């Protein structure tokens, strides 16, 4: 859990993913298209990935635990949540508030 907190606070936008996850790819692409440059942590390529995945579930991440998105050091949700925030316009404002994007 400590590693999740540490990694999620190092950059304005952080996404925990798995390299083979299509929804993870979609969320990363959305962030890039909005002008953000999130830190990406591929759990399937990290020796502590399984442990971090359990920690993400404990934070309230859904099943599957990825993508798990943090903005401004705060967990904001998984793919379903991020798409909802994008549709209602609040994702862009969250990214602006966290200084992950400027425009």
UniProtKB/Swiss-Prot annotation:
It is found in: Cytoplasm. Its main location: cytoplasm. Transmembrane segments: none annotated. Keywords: Cytoplasm, Disulfide bond, Electron transport, Redox-active center, Transport. Residues 1-102 form the Glutaredoxin domain. Pfam families: Glutaredoxin. GO terms for biological process: negative regulation of transcription by RNA polymerase II; response to nitrate. One of its GO terms (cellular component) is cytoplasm. CDD domains: GRX_GRXh_1_2_like. PANTHER family: GLUTAREDOXIN. Has a glutathione-disulfide oxidoreductase activity in the presence of NADPH and glutathione reductase. Reduces low molecular weight disulfides and proteins. Belongs to the glutaredoxin family. CC-type subfamily. This is Glutaredoxin-C11. It comes from Arabidopsis thaliana (Mouse-ear cress). The gene is GRXC11.
């Amino acid at each position: 859990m400590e590693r999740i907190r540490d990694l999620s606070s190092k950059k304005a936008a952080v996404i925990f993913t798995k390299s083979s996850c299509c929804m993870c790819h979609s969320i990363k692409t959305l962030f890039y298209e909005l002008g953000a440059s999130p830190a990406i942590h591929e759990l399937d390529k990290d020796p502590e990935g399984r442990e971090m995945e359990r920690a993400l579930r404990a934070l309230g991440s859904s099943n599957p635990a990825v993508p798990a998105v943090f903005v401004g050091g705060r967990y904001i949700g998984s793919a379903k949540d991020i798409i909802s925030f994008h549709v209602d316009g609040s994702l862009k404002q969250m990214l602006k508030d966290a200084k992950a994007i400027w425009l």
